[in-house]
Protein backbone atom coordinates (compact mmCIF):
# COMPACT_ATOMS: atom_id res chain seq x y z
CA UNK A 1 0.00 0.00 0.00
CA UNK A 2 1.46 3.42 -0.92
CA UNK A 3 2.14 5.87 1.91
CA UNK A 4 1.37 9.59 1.99
CA UNK A 5 3.02 12.21 4.20
CA UNK A 6 0.42 13.76 6.51
CA UNK A 7 0.82 16.73 8.86
CA UNK A 8 -1.54 17.15 11.79
CA UNK A 9 -2.12 20.91 12.03
CA UNK A 10 -4.80 20.72 14.73
CA UNK A 11 -3.84 18.80 17.88
CA UNK A 12 -7.45 17.64 18.36
CA UNK A 13 -6.98 15.42 15.29
CA UNK A 14 -4.04 13.46 16.72
CA UNK A 15 -6.44 10.68 17.72
CA UNK A 16 -8.84 11.20 14.80
CA UNK A 17 -6.63 11.06 11.74
CA UNK A 18 -8.21 10.25 8.38
CA UNK A 19 -8.81 6.51 8.31
CA UNK A 20 -10.78 3.97 6.33
CA UNK A 21 -13.93 3.08 8.30
CA UNK A 22 -14.12 -0.47 6.90
CA UNK A 23 -11.79 -2.72 4.88
CA UNK A 24 -13.89 -1.94 1.79
CA UNK A 25 -13.99 1.84 2.24
CA UNK A 26 -12.68 3.91 -0.66
CA UNK A 27 -12.84 7.25 1.16
CA UNK A 28 -11.28 8.64 4.31
CA UNK A 29 -13.46 11.00 6.34
CA UNK A 30 -12.29 14.60 6.75
CA UNK A 31 -13.31 16.58 9.83
CA UNK A 32 -14.14 20.23 10.45
CA UNK A 33 -11.19 21.71 12.35
CA UNK A 34 -13.22 24.63 13.69
CA UNK A 35 -13.18 26.05 17.21
CA UNK A 36 -16.90 26.62 17.68
CA UNK A 37 -20.18 25.56 16.13
CA UNK A 38 -20.87 27.48 12.94
CA UNK A 39 -24.06 27.97 10.99
CA UNK A 40 -24.26 27.64 7.22
CA UNK A 41 -27.40 29.29 5.93
CA UNK A 42 -29.29 28.06 2.84
CA UNK A 43 -27.40 29.08 -0.31
CA UNK A 44 -24.25 29.95 1.64
CA UNK A 45 -20.77 28.52 1.07
CA UNK A 46 -18.00 28.30 3.65
CA UNK A 47 -14.37 27.28 3.40
CA UNK A 48 -13.78 24.85 6.28
CA UNK A 49 -10.28 23.85 7.43
CA UNK A 50 -9.63 20.15 8.01
CA UNK A 51 -6.64 20.56 10.31
CA UNK A 52 -4.45 18.37 8.09
CA UNK A 53 -1.96 18.92 5.31
CA UNK A 54 -0.76 16.22 2.99
CA UNK A 55 1.91 15.78 0.35
CA UNK A 56 1.23 12.99 -2.13
CA UNK A 57 4.57 13.71 -3.83
CA UNK A 58 4.19 10.98 -6.45
CA UNK A 59 2.70 12.49 -9.65
CA UNK A 60 0.95 9.17 -10.29
CA UNK A 61 -1.55 10.05 -7.53
CA UNK A 62 -4.03 12.79 -6.70
CA UNK A 63 -6.57 13.21 -3.93
CA UNK A 64 -10.22 13.91 -4.63
CA UNK A 65 -12.45 15.56 -2.05
CA UNK A 66 -16.02 14.31 -2.33
CA UNK A 67 -19.22 15.00 -0.40
CA UNK A 68 -20.51 12.61 2.23
CA UNK A 69 -23.70 11.06 0.92
CA UNK A 70 -25.68 11.43 4.15
CA UNK A 71 -24.96 15.15 4.47
CA UNK A 72 -26.04 15.76 0.90
CA UNK A 73 -29.17 13.64 1.02
CA UNK A 74 -30.41 14.53 4.50
CA UNK A 75 -29.24 18.14 4.85
CA UNK A 76 -28.37 19.45 1.36
CA UNK A 77 -24.71 19.89 2.34
CA UNK A 78 -22.45 19.35 -0.67
CA UNK A 79 -19.15 20.74 -1.91
CA UNK A 80 -19.13 24.27 -3.27
CA UNK A 81 -16.81 23.19 -6.08
CA UNK A 82 -18.61 19.82 -6.52
CA UNK A 83 -15.31 17.89 -6.42
CA UNK A 84 -12.04 19.04 -4.93
CA UNK A 85 -8.79 18.00 -6.56
CA UNK A 86 -5.47 17.96 -4.70
CA UNK A 87 -2.42 17.69 -6.91
CA UNK A 88 0.55 15.55 -5.91
CA UNK A 89 2.81 18.57 -5.36
CA UNK A 90 0.43 20.48 -3.05
CA UNK A 91 1.66 20.66 0.55
CA UNK A 92 -0.77 23.03 2.29
CA UNK A 93 -3.73 22.52 4.57
CA UNK A 94 -6.72 20.78 3.04
CA UNK A 95 -9.85 22.94 3.05
CA UNK A 96 -13.37 21.90 2.13
CA UNK A 97 -15.72 24.27 0.33
CA UNK A 98 -19.08 23.50 1.95
CA UNK A 99 -22.30 24.64 0.24
CA UNK A 100 -25.72 24.47 1.85
CA UNK A 101 -28.07 23.85 -1.07
CA UNK A 102 -30.83 22.89 1.35
CA UNK A 103 -33.66 24.98 2.78
CA UNK A 104 -32.63 24.90 6.45
CA UNK A 105 -29.68 26.40 8.30
CA UNK A 106 -27.08 23.69 8.94
CA UNK A 107 -25.09 23.66 12.17
CA UNK A 108 -21.55 22.36 11.87
CA UNK A 109 -19.84 21.38 15.13
CA UNK A 110 -16.10 21.11 15.76
CA UNK A 111 -14.67 17.84 14.41
CA UNK A 112 -17.85 16.86 12.55
CA UNK A 113 -17.11 14.72 9.51
CA UNK A 114 -17.71 17.01 6.51
CA UNK A 115 -16.30 15.31 3.42
CA UNK A 116 -14.34 12.31 2.27
CA UNK A 117 -11.02 12.05 0.51
CA UNK A 118 -10.19 9.39 -2.07
CA UNK A 119 -6.66 8.83 -3.38
CA UNK A 120 -6.80 8.09 -7.11
CA UNK A 121 -4.29 7.13 -9.79
CA UNK A 122 -3.41 9.77 -12.36
CA UNK A 123 -2.19 9.29 -15.90
CA UNK A 124 -0.50 12.28 -17.50
CA UNK A 125 -0.62 12.24 -21.29
CA UNK A 126 0.98 13.91 -24.25
CA UNK A 127 -1.37 15.13 -26.98
CA UNK A 128 -0.92 14.31 -30.63
CA UNK A 129 -2.70 16.81 -32.89
CA UNK A 130 -4.65 15.10 -35.72
CA UNK A 131 -6.92 16.27 -38.51
CA UNK A 132 -9.41 13.40 -38.11
CA UNK A 133 -10.18 10.65 -35.63
CA UNK A 134 -10.52 6.97 -36.41
CA UNK A 135 -14.27 6.22 -36.64
CA UNK A 136 -16.08 4.79 -33.64
CA UNK A 137 -19.66 3.55 -33.34
CA UNK A 138 -20.55 6.52 -31.16
CA UNK A 139 -18.87 9.24 -33.16
CA UNK A 140 -19.51 12.73 -31.82
CA UNK A 141 -22.88 11.93 -30.23
CA UNK A 142 -23.16 13.18 -26.68
CA UNK A 143 -25.60 14.41 -24.03
CA UNK A 144 -27.98 11.48 -24.10
CA UNK A 145 -27.14 10.13 -27.54
CA UNK A 146 -26.82 6.57 -26.20
CA UNK A 147 -30.40 6.62 -24.85
CA UNK A 148 -31.96 6.36 -21.42
CA UNK A 149 -32.67 2.63 -21.16
UniProtKB/Swiss-Prot annotation:
Its cofactor is Mg(2+). Substrate binds at residues 68-70, 81, 85-87. Its EC number is 3.6.1.23. PANTHER family: DEOXYURIDINE 5'-TRIPHOSPHATE NUCLEOTIDOHYDROLASE (PTHR11241:SF0). HAMAP family: dUTPase_bact. Belongs to the dUTPase family. This is Deoxyuridine 5'-triphosphate nucleotidohydrolase.
Amino acid sequence: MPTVDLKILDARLADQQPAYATPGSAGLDLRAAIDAETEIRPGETRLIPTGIALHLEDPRYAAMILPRSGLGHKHGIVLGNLVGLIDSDYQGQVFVSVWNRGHETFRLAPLDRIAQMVIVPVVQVDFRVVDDFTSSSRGSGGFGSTGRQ
